[in-house]
Every structure is written in C-alpha cells, then in structure tokens.
C-alpha cells in the first residue's frame, strides 16, 4: 500500500465561509465564539474530505485565521511592542488580527506588520519582525487544541509547522539590514530552538507520530552559513520523540541537495512538478529507512495530472523504496480552489480538463492505487478516464486561434521603443500642466454593496444593458466629482464596472474561462478568483475605452486609463501548461497594445498599465532571473510602445522589493511608476536612489490594507524622506494601492489628508 498525504488544504471553505465569518467578527456582527465555531466546522469538513480521499494523515496547522506564518509567529510570542501585548500572557485573536491588519474589535489600532509575497506565489504572508536578543515562548494553544479536535473526530494527524530556518529567513528587522540571508538572524536560533523542541515534545505527548516541518527556504540560493545552520538545527530537533517530515516545495533542491540529504529527519518531501529531474538523485541519496514524499500532483495549477507520466516517473523509485515512497501534492493546496463540484456553469468540455483541491486528492488516491498494483477494475477505469480527458484537451479546436498564431509569428518586428524620457516628460508637462508633487490614486475606489449588486443583477439578467450602463456612468460621475472636490490632480474613473483587476480583462479576452466559485486566498480575508487561460489570447473588441472616454468627458483634468499589465494577468491566472508561459504573455501584450492605442485615440492622455506581479514571477534561483526578466520587460514594452510621446504611461507595483530588479524596472521605461512604500517607511526607495532611477516615481504615502486614516504630518514626513533620496520634481503623491477594499468615510478622510500633505510640500 502506498501512503498518500497532503501538505495543506485550502482554509477558506468551499463557499468562502471563513472570509465571511472573519469579516463579520471584525465588523462586530459576530462574536468570537461564533467565529471559533465556524473554524471548527470548516476544519472538521476539510479533515473528513481528505480522509475520504484516502489521505493517511490529515494535516493540522494548515488552518489560519489570517495567515499561517502569522499563526506561527504568534505561537512563538513574537509580538512587536507597538501592539501592547502583555509580557508572558497568551496571544489572543485580536492581537493576531491587529498584527495582520492594524486593528481588531479590541485593542488600540497600530501599524500593521509588513505583508509580502509567499515565495513566487500570489499568496501573501505577514512578515515576522525580528530583533537582536529576542525571546520566544509558546504563547498560543491553537495548534495543540486543533490536534485534539482532529483526533477526537477519529483522524490520524500530521501537524504542519514552519521550519525555524525558513521562519527566520522570511523575517525582517532593522538590525538585519543584509536582507533575508543576514547571518545575524541565525543568532536567534539559541532562543528559538527550545520553543520548537517544546512544541514537538507536546505534540508527541498528544500521540502524534509524524510532524511536517516546512523548509521551502531549502530551494533558494542559500549562503553557506545558512546551509551549515540546517545541520546544527536539525541535529537538535531530531532528538524529539516525533518523526520529522521535512517539506520543500516551489523548486528543486539543486545545490542544497547534499544539505537536505544530510539532515537527520525521518522523511523528505520534494517538489517533482517544478523539478522532476531531482527525483533520481534524491531517491539514491536517502538513508536506510528514510521516507521520500514525492510531490507529483501540481498544487499550484488547475489542470488534470498526466497520471501515466507520473506512473512512469515513479515506478523505478517505487521498486527501489517500496513502502518508503509516499505520494503528495507538490505543495499545499492553499493555492488552488476547493472543489469543482461548485462549478455548475462551466461547459462540460472545459470542466473535464480541470482539477481543484478535492479532485487533486482523488487523483492522488488513484495514482497511489495504480502505483501499488491495485487490481480493482475501477483503478484502470479511472486511469482510462484521465487519459481520455487529457487527449480531448490536446485535440480541442478551442485552444488554437490561427489569427493569433499569425500575429505571434510577426511580433518580433513590432516596435518596443519610445522617444527618450526627457523628451517625453517635457512634452507631457506642457500638455498636462501638473503642479509639483502631483496627486493621484492607483485606480479603484470603494466597491460598495450597491456596486456589487449592480454587477450581479446585470450578469444574472435582472438588469438590462442600458440600465446597467446608466448606473455605472452615475457611479463614475460621482467618483470624478469627488476627486475634483478633494483636489486630486490626475483622476481615475474608479473602476465600478470591475470585480477584479484580472478577471475583468479575462472576461473580455478570447482564450479565457471563468469559474463561479474558484476562489483562492490572497491575503487575510481577501480572496481572488483567478481566470483560466486555456487557449490563445486575443482582444475581440475594446475593453475599457468607453468607460475611460466617458470619465474624461466629465472633467478638464486628466483621467487615467486603467489596464492590468500582461505579466500580472499571466501571474494571477491559472495558465495553460501546453506552451511556454512567455508565449502566453506575448499574446496578452499584443492584445493590450491594441487597447492602449485605442485609449490614446479616444483622448486619454495618461494610461496606467499595472504590473504589481512582475517581481513575483521571478524564478526562485537567481541564475534563472535574466531569462524571465528579459521577456517580462519586453512584454510590458510591447504593450505600451504604440503611443506617442505626449501620452504619459504609468505603471504600479505593490508588495514588492525592488533592489535586485531595479535595472529591469528602469528598462520598462514607464514615465511614472507608483509603488508600495508606506509599510516599509520608504526603505524601498533606497533601490531607486542607489540606481539613480531616471523617471518619475510615486512612493505610496499610506497603507490601504489597513483601515487606519493616516495623519497629514506623517504623510508629509514620508514624502520628505522620499525627497531626501530622489529629486523632488520627479515625485508624485499617492496611496500604496487601489482603494477597492476600503470604506468611503476612511477613503475621503485619507485622500483629503493626502492632498493637504502635497500642498504642504509645495508650500515648503
């Protein structure tokens, strides 16, 4: 019998029950006990579904109220002083929420902890804050209580915890200025490891046999000091009475292979979707009795698995390892939707190509039975059905568009060049006549319940096209008038017609499909529903021109056209796996180029092409960066270079660290870049200062992920810090990101303050 297990299950619920419960608690509409009851019900349902699929150990510890790294940070008692947590007391739920979002039903608001991308995914984690001499202790009981919950329901459990070195690698602190690999962070291990030891001892006391300890940092470029630390750390942790399954994912071990194989752990999980070529070396390097967990089902995409190929890859290793070969998804299933059963509106053909979390576990079970030689006819029938679905997808005429193929064949000859920036900016200033420290927003304005109801009624047919258009026009006019009243310089139309910055465009492009309930967690309670790129991408008609032109007709101030860039659409979609991602991105760039040209022709003088995801697309290994950055930058320029020098091109990036890709950002050659900087206290600007970034830049002056309204003096101080690093004539004033998730009262107060801050700076 082949053991199958799972690294983690989506925590949000099939109907986003967790999101709704958490937000109701934040709003005071639900008690803490009701929230905890929702959590218990979700965990029970998720454990049962995994057990029903044949998972040998259900994962415990993959559930989180906001973020699993934040859960672990609070378990360790690593609460920054500004949150006022009493020394030695258990960390309560509201403290956790204040760390994640700045406020909670109880406790004083405080600046939220930094949030950034989880490796190269579209999930965000809350960054641990580290200080020299920091102390740690077991400060929350949730993990242990959830183990007992699962056991009471009759499940064998496998607790899942972040490994100490990955947790430190992800952490930041002012004293650790050398970045993730700062060796000073390793000095915290002496205080940290006893707490890990205590956790493992307590889990053993609950009857736990295996603990999954996640160390995805092992797939990164590690300094030698960190490699050495792995050996020392796991020599100590191996003394615990539980068996450790060390999990790596998102890439291969590569030059860290010897380090991983030398660790005294009972099992090792590797990602064979991202790095199938490591299988032989890993298997041959195992010690006697050591388990190999093979991550063969893609935990990050939604296509059915080629089980025949997986069987062919695994058969020799199964022969070698026998029962010591375990099967699992490549990584946690956090990154895919919960269940295809909720997709009642996808056509049968496309539905047959897909696999969500529940289906991936079923695939895993089928693969395990086939690998173990199960003689049940249902196994062969299942393999045959899988084979037929893959063949149907390969042969479907829906995938290939001859017109797109023809255009792609000639895209190399399409210009990516614009006039020099100095020439462009002079022309743009003469046309736009903007003041010093011009103010703008990033694009979206609050999406009220009324706006969401409008879109919902229109999509369901309850609202006619003309009634919907009139209602959206009214919303746009209100946003324009509001911005004029506040005194913003470059306006936006507010995007009331858009449910999501990627899904909106996907609905208007050929080659995309959409789920009804394919939600995945992005951060906190924020969920996104990524489109599915299943075929060649083309733009049948203009997508934004009508709304932008209408908004511009209402005001003499410039109104930005708002587009999502090709790399971000790619990164935030589930992308076809039958051609290189680069090819799909170029198809997107050509479609967006047509839209940019049409916006200019409609009188739009400022066009923003958002690329918040360009850094997250970076391969995890630096040796692979150049190839990616070359085509990513080329795709951006392909989408923007069709307009004249008087048209000002903006781009926006958020949740990013720029130091190591600043040259490529400059090569994108946007006239203005707006970035997230407020949570980092403008530290991200150092990259632009050191590089002598040549174009205009708008460093975000307040954090839109927090409901806290910023003080004017604080925003002025942030901009003065920016002006100390960059020429003030090239600085813009703007929020960190779009305002979609904020309420109107806090939005109005924050923007009034932001405009006042800009006026203060001009008067100085």
Curated annotation (Swiss-Prot):
Biological source species: Bordetella parapertussis (strain 12822 / ATCC BAA-587 / NCTC 13253)
Protein purpose: Catalyzes the transfer of a methyl group from 5-methyltetrahydrofolate to homocysteine resulting in methionine formation.
Coiled-coil regions listed in the entry: none
The keyword Repeat belongs to this UniProt entry's keyword annotation: yes
Keywords of this entry: Amino-acid biosynthesis, Metal-binding, Methionine biosynthesis, Methyltransferase, Repeat, Transferase, Zinc
GO biological process, one term: methylation
EC number in record: 2.1.1.14
Positions of the catalytic residues: 705
Name of the protein: 5-methyltetrahydropteroyltriglutamate--homocysteine methyltransferase
Binding site for L-homocysteine: 442-444, 495, 610
Gene: metE
Binding site for 5-methyltetrahydropteroyltri-L-glutamate: 16-19, 117, 526-527, 572, 616
Functional pathway: Amino-acid biosynthesis; L-methionine biosynthesis via de novo pathway; L-methionine from L-homocysteine (MetE route): step 1/1
Alphabetical list of NCBIfam families matching this protein: met_syn_B12ind, PRK05222.1
Binding positions (L-methionine): 442-444, 495, 610
